[in-house]
From Swiss-Prot:
E.C. code: 6.2.1.12
Reaction(s) the record says it catalyses: (E)-4-coumarate + ATP + CoA = (E)-4-coumaroyl-CoA + AMP + diphosphate; (E)-4-coumarate + ATP + H(+) = (E)-4-coumaroyl-AMP + diphosphate; (E)-4-coumaroyl-AMP + CoA = (E)-4-coumaroyl-CoA + AMP + H(+)
Primary gene name: 4CL2
Cofactor(s) named in the record: Mg(2+)
Protein name: 4-coumarate--CoA ligase 2
Amino acid sequence: MPMDIETKQSGDLIFRSKLPDIYIPKHLPLHSYCFENLSEFNSRPCLIDGANDRIYTYAEVELTSRKVAVGLNKLGIQQKDTIMILLPNCPEFVFAFIGASYLGAISTMANPLFTPAEVVKQAKASSAKIVITQACFAGKVKDYAIENDLKVICVDSAPEGCVHFSELIQSDEHEIPDVKIQPDDVVALPYSSGTTGLPKGVMLTHKGLVTSVAQQVDGENANLYMHSDDVLMCVLPLFHIYSLNSVLLCALRVGAAILIMQKFDIAQFLELIPKHKVTIGPFVPPIVLAIAKSPLVHNYDLSSVRTVMSGAAPLGKELEDAVRAKFPNAKLGQGYGMTEAGPVLAMCLAFAKEPFDIKSGACGTVVRNAEMKIVDPDTGCSLPRNQPGEICIRGDQIMKGYLNDPEATARTIEKEGWLHTGDIGFIDDDDELFIVDRLKELIKYKGFQVAPAELEALLINHPDISDAAVVPMIDEQAGEVPVAFVVRSNGSTITEDEVKDFISKQVIFYKRIKRVFFVETVPKSPSGKILRKDLRARLAAGISN
């Protein structure tokens, strides 16, 4: 059954899910929604700490989160105040985030590997009143904390001037203040990656996150089918919205167990899957690539995994096929999201309770209770099937706006509620969405459009190439030409000419790579997106091969 296409008065062609709309309890605060069915799985595992195998039950997680809420309140945090969570994946991240939600407070999440300047910039921009971190990162905010009366809480050892997280947990959960949380109140403030400009605070509301989680896991035929016997691998950083939403919040809603890894290590990762019988693996392309290329995979039994989903960046067909062979019982597919969209716009219907057939390379179909359209970037007119254009989404799941930036908000969200993603894609005859590339990342060769993602998919399919990124280089005659940054596989001596020849045999003339630069690593954001602006900056500075 195809998505419904409605012709609006404006002439827009609007795409909707193959799945019927569902009731979503948008009046509930996020924590109430996540724990709505708590009595059904009180004693079941909620969090499993991969570092030490400690298990926290659902009852323990809910109780500890309420204690943390009281502890934060005693330190002065009130409704609509902001806390900063500067942590790698750990149970305390979960307690802090849910605890803040109970207070009607806001969590802004930051990468603990940020420089001190980056951390302070986000703390200042978000008006954070407390930072929750580890002792090894506390120094990054020390001076700013002293100057601005900012309290620093450490989850391990507490250096001088810091509060230990255990003090929060000692609070009496019955002393939680009575707050009236509105559906449109902000609960999470992630900062968008900044790959197309300066990082901006993305205001995600209780209603927005409840809607997004429900679009994935609620309903008789859930789009992303999960249940209380599932174990999700949480290796993606919780400070990124993909992991926070599609791993943590979705799992909490259905009563599944969440296996927490602080960071990705292929050997430990492969060891934990059979040890804890992991059933669902939410990954990003760099992890998928590591699995596909690792010789260690054959030493482990990965048969428990029934779902492998990839998001944050497009995954090529060849990489999909390579990983499919590693997980014998898993359905493999992609989702598509962006922070501003809450984040999920599309999800693979092979993951549904009653699955649909899908095509390799597609990144799903639009989620239910939402609308999608494809527009011409130049004219703004909506486009029919199979024509690439900018992807736009509308629904209760999208952000409220950018914090203190009404101009950027107005540029991103139209008055009619359409959020412009800046991504180029098309919807085919079977209602599946295909991402072509980022609008701003398209290379223009004499007016022809060259999509870096297409060339990258070809490059990493070469056995002597372990990773690659393609960016534009200014050219006097052509305007821009594609150049590649390539990471050689171990022991490889592949040359620039060999790489160029490999690509030229597979693409039209204007897509041929003009230069190849060999590098140790391709710079990427925590979510796995290639940091093209860093590579363009190296070109501008006159990189030498």
